[in-house]
């Protein structure tokens, strides 16, 4: 064994060994317990950043640990290769998206191998490969034939910069999730999948996900947004027309003061026919433009229709308005009954147009409740509510509901915020939708034997945003008739919604999936990824899994048993404005700056002299150009050092602020472990050791500490997933072993070996390269990749006792010996029941018992 630790030499040797021996390749084995561990697949964005490293090292640590438990572990990897990031990067680099994507994959794949990730590379998926998206297209045709997919004209979220539609889940605070552009609303033909058919199941099955973060489940519940209420018919004064409105907050029903309808409401036609002056106003009312402002507008625009609805209980007249402050894609419900006293947007509108505001709730102190207090209100009394005055909120809800139903004014109804999933995008770099359209606009799905429909090649690297321009690809013959291909492509979440299933059978060519493989591996035992995917990928994944179950490709109801949402890796983030006014994000490494007395960055400039604005720490991302390339760290310190730092720096679910300082400490620890092993081998080689049949006290202490650490680390990795505390315990044990070796004149070599082997096995999931070599040095020709996790064995360790001093009113009475495992309750119970103490107490009343852990019990008597 060499005296000095050489990370490059070690890691190169070990990685070659893994590759030559296909160490992590796995097949189904019914004789073994399976474990399916996977991290969310990356976009091939060019290079891995530290956020990637954290995600994939987390998964690798868990996979390696589970292998050591003797399980058959599937740990695959793939690439989410379609979509805007690759297309934008390709345009910027003036090459085709395909070439950019493949070159990025090769680079990032090499980085993952350098990290030492234990993937089964034979199962690698690239979603832009026709061999993958062929089955996605087939699945879509099956959904269409089952009436689960459809095309309709719909108002959609439109990103003017990326020139594509966004699903509701991809709009954050009315901004594009990718480029932060203001979202507009357009009405165009789009493809949808009926996720709403599964709304109840998606909601109810959240209760079965015991090992998912509570926050993710809350986010999905809120997104699905199930509510129960009443569909109420409002008659329009002096007409035969009616408006159907869904009302969920029945306790404040008497506070309705006006009605709002959208421009899409069927009543608009009636207005245009009967009220030409209003029709002209409607025509000039650019709904598409104003809708983009939606709820972000401080003031809401509207048109009074000159019509009035009649409140079904109070018979008061309610003016009907057309407005932009609410939006729905629901064809039936295009109206709301406004209760401005208890809704901020409706209140703003009412104030602007001088509409009535009717408060209907007081608290028990006769104080009127407004919208600020209403949402968190638990108790209140109705007033201004006619026959319902004096009722509390619950009774008011029940009585008003009963009145509406019994008088046939309304009927019970269940609503969801969830809308069908818009899956079509107006971009080039995506999987083609396998549909043909005839001259008569009839839709034909492409037959299975003609799949995949392959994306046309970009000509001369000239990227055209839409497939509309590829005329030679669009027009084809079908039954000797000229038809047109669908020019939209799939949303990339279509690819990522089922890749976990395809990992189980990547070489299977008979159908979408091999049920034998999916039913062996599913559900996924551990899934790792960011919480930002809670209402997008994770919801679509659950939905697709249920579709695949209903097609008999898999049996279980949920795809993922345990979910770990790792925290973000943050780094300093800078930008400047170009001459054209565009915000340009610049890399943290290409800048100079100063720090003020509060340690805040000031006077930052880049290498070109641009004055930079520092926005603090933010998530590493390609879009903000603040990612740190791990390659420099790996080149200098090795991937084991990087892995150890990433796992030790913070609990996995919390954000980690990146700095290079912790790297040095992690590297120092690995060198210490190397030195301890080197010294042990020298002790053995020079015969400077003894074997003791009888263990000395320091031996017992070291062994007892070792078995405590095994137990603690096992719980931290397996149950708690607090990997940082697991590493901390191993470091303490390593320091203890080092002290044992340095302080003792005569070392028990068998104890050193035993503890050292425990440490190396405990560290193997975290720093596999150096542990592989150290293990092989201690146990010649023995492969740690096939070694079991250490078990607790303590038969040779005496049961330690703790002596507790017993006092009465502060005076020493006796000392009682207890087993070290006894807790406070047992100790107090035994002391009180001790015969000597019983006699001393002589039935006197005890006022208090004070316990100082593992030291003293003081019984305080009542003087009375």
Curated annotation (Swiss-Prot):
It catalyses: tRNA(Leu) + L-leucine + ATP = L-leucyl-tRNA(Leu) + AMP + diphosphate. Its EC number is 6.1.1.4. Keywords: Aminoacyl-tRNA synthetase, ATP-binding, Cytoplasm, Ligase, Nucleotide-binding, Protein biosynthesis. InterPro entries: aa-tRNA-synth_I_CS, aa-tRNA-synth_Ia, Leu-tRNA-ligase, Leu_tRNA-synth_edit, M/V/L/I-tRNA-synth_anticd-bd, Methionyl/Leucyl_tRNA_Synth, Rossmann-like_a/b/a_fold, tRNAsynth_Ia_anticodon-bd. The keyword Membrane does not apply. ATP binds at residue 622. NCBIfam families: leuS_bact. It is found in: Cytoplasm. It comes from the Bacteria. GO terms for molecular function: aminoacyl-tRNA deacylase activity; ATP binding; leucine-tRNA ligase activity. Pfam families: Anticodon_1, tRNA-synt_1, tRNA-synt_1_2, tRNA-synt_1g. A motif ('KMSKS' region) lies at residues 619-623. Transmembrane segments: none annotated. This is Leucine--tRNA ligase. It comes from Wigglesworthia glossinidia brevipalpis. GO terms for cellular component: cytosol.
């Amino acid at each position: 064994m060499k005296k000095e630790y050489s990370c490059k030499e070690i890691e190169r040797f070990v990685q070659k060994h893994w590759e030559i021996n296909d160490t992590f390749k796995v097949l189904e084995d019914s004789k073994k317990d399976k474990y399916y561990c996977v991290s969310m697949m990356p976009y091939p964005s060019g290079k891995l950043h530290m956020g990637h490293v954290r995600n994939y090292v987390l998964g690798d640590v868990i996979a390696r640990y589970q292998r050591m438990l003797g399980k058959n572990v599937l740990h695959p990897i793939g690439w989410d290769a379609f979509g805007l990031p690759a297309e934008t990067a390709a345009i910027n680099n003036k090459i085709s998206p395909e070439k950019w994507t493949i070159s990025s994959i090769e680079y990032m794949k090499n980085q993952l191998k350098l990290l030492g990730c234990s993937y089964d590379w034979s199962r690698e998926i690239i979603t832009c490969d026709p061999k993958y998206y062929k089955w996605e297209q087939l699945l879509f045709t099956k959904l269409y034939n089952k009436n689960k997919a459809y095309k309709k004209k719909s108002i959609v979220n439109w990103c003017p910069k990326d020139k594509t539609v966004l699903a509701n889940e991809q709009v954050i605070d009315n901004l594009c999730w990718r480029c932060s552009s203001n979202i507009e609303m357009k009405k165009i033909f789009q493809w949808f999948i009926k996720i709403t058919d599964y709304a109840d199941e998606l909601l109810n099955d959240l209760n079965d996900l015991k090992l998912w973060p509570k926050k993710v489940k809350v986010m999905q519940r809120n997104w699905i947004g199930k509510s129960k209420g009443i569909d109420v018919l409002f008659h329009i004064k002096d007409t035969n027309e009616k408006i159907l409105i869904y009302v969920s907050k029945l306790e404040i029903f008497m506070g309705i003061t006006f009605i709002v309808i959208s421009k899409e409401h069927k009543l608009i036609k009636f207005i245009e026919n009967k009220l030409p002056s209003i029709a002209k106003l409607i025509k000039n009312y650019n709904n598409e433009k104003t809708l983009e402002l939606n709820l972000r507008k401080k003031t809401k625009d509207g048109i009074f229709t000159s019509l009035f609805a009649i409140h079904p209980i109070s018979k008061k007249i309610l003016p009907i308005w057309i407005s932009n402050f609410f939006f729905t894609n629901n064809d039936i419900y295009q109206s709301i009954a406004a209760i401005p006293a208890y809704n901020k947007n409706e209140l703003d509108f009412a104030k602007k147009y001088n509409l009535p505001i009717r408060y209907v709730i007081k608290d028990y102190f006769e104080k009127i409740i407004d919208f600020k207090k209403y949402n968190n209100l638990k108790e209140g009394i109705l007033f201004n509510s006619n026959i319902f005055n004096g009722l509390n909120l619950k009774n008011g809800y029940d009585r008003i509901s009963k009145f509406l139903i019994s008088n046939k004014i309304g009927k019970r109804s269940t609503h969801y915020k969830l809308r069908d999933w818009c899956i079509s995008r107006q971009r080039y770099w995506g999987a083609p939708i396998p549909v043909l359209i005839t001259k008569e606009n009839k839709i034909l799905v492409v037959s299975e034997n003609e799949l995949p429909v392959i994306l046309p090649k970009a000509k001369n690297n000239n990227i055209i945003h839409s497939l509309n321009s590829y005329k030679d690809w669009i027009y084809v013959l079908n039954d000797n008739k000229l038809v047109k291909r669908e020019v939209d492509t799939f949303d990339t979440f279509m690819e990522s919604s089922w890749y976990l299933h395809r990992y189980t059978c990547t070489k299977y060519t008979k159908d979408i999936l091999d049920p034998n493989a999916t039913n062996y591996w599913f559900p996924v035992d551990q899934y790792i990824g960011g919480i930002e995917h809670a209402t997008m990928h994770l919801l679509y994944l659950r939905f697709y899994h249920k579709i695949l179950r209903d097609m008999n490709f898999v049996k279980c109801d949920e795809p993922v048993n345990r979910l770990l949402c790792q925290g973000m890796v943050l780094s300093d983030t800078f930008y400047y404005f170009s001459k054209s006014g565009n915000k340009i994000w610049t890399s943290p490494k290409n800048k100079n700056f100063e720090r003020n007395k509060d340690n805040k960055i000031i006077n930052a400039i880049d290498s070109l002299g641009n004055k930079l604005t520092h926005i603090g720490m933010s998530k590493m991302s390609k879009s903000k150009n603040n990612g740190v390339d791990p390659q420099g760290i790996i080149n200098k310190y090795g991937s084991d050092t990087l892995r150890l730092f990433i796992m030790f720096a913070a609990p996995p679910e919390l954000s980690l602020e990146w700095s290079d300082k912790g790297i040095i400490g992690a590297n120092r620890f690995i060198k210490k472990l190397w030195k301890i092993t080197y010294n042990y081998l020298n002790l053995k080689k020079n015969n400077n050791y003894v074997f003791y049949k009888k263990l000395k006290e320091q031996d017992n202490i070291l062994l007892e500490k070792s078995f405590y650490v095994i137990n603690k680390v096992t719980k931290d990795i397996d149950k708690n997933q607090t990997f940082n505390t697991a590493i901390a315990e191993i470091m303490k044990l390593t320091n203890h072993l080092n002290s044992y070796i340095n302080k003792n004149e005569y070392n028990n070599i068998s104890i050193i070996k035993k503890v050292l082997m425990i440490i190396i096995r405990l560290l193997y999931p975290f720093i596999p390269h150096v542990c592989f070599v150290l293990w092989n040095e201690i146990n010649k020709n023995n492969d740690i990749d096939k070694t079991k996790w250490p078990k607790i064995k303590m038969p040779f360790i005496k049961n330690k006792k703790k002596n507790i001093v017993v006092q009465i009113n502060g005076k020493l009475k006796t000392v009682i010996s207890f087993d070290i495992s006894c807790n406070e309750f047992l100790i107090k119970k035994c002391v009180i029941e001790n015969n000597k103490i019983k006699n001393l107490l002589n039935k006197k009343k005890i006022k208090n018992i004070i316990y100082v852990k593992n030291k003293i019990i003081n019984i305080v008597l009542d003087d009375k």
